[in-house]
């Protein structure tokens, strides 16, 4: 690939990431795969309602490795998706399912950086672009019972401005990356035009 693409930005980081998968990641992925899926913790030990999605610690180890390698922040620092997709290629070779949180995080940060309110961007983007374990994950919550990828036709969730935010009313049939810290949600403001431009 290097012969066709020229020098690879972050080549050392990519080699280190692949090496990590060979040394540790494969075994973690295999063990996590056998251990089962995440589970919902509805209450803490004191009976307080928490509704927290729990994953094995090893899962977080795998996930954070890709974030720290730059699957998100490199796309912005290098003004290109190439390194991000190269990291994703390595990740997908070893654990295809793990690439999903990365792609939906990109699908969150890109429209947010382009269309988000300045106050939201100032609050959220720095957290999603961190290069350490405290990085925020993103999610996209679009699909409704009508289904399909035609958001303009099938999104019935409404958005009503309330104070500094919005109240959303509706149901999502599928949401990606339920363990995310922030989500982009498709909704139609009350009185907005039909079609995708009204979302």
Identify the residue ranges that each predicted region occupies.
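Extended, charge-enriched "interface" segments that sit outside catalytic cores
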Residues: 1-77
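Secondary-structure capping and boundary motifs in well-ordered enzyme cores
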Residues: 35, 54-55, 79-83, 100, ...
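Extended, domain-scale alpha-helical bundle/helix-rich regions
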Residues: 76-108
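Short, solvent-exposed loop/turn segments at the edges of secondary structure
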Residues: 103, 135, 152-154, 178-180, ...
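N-terminal glycine-rich flavin-associated loop
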Residues: 103-119
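Buried hydrophobic positions in well-ordered alpha/beta secondary-structure cores of metabolic enzymes
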Residues: 108, 140, 168-170
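Internal maturation/activation junctions in enzymes
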Residues: 116-166
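A short core secondary-structure module
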Residues: 169-199
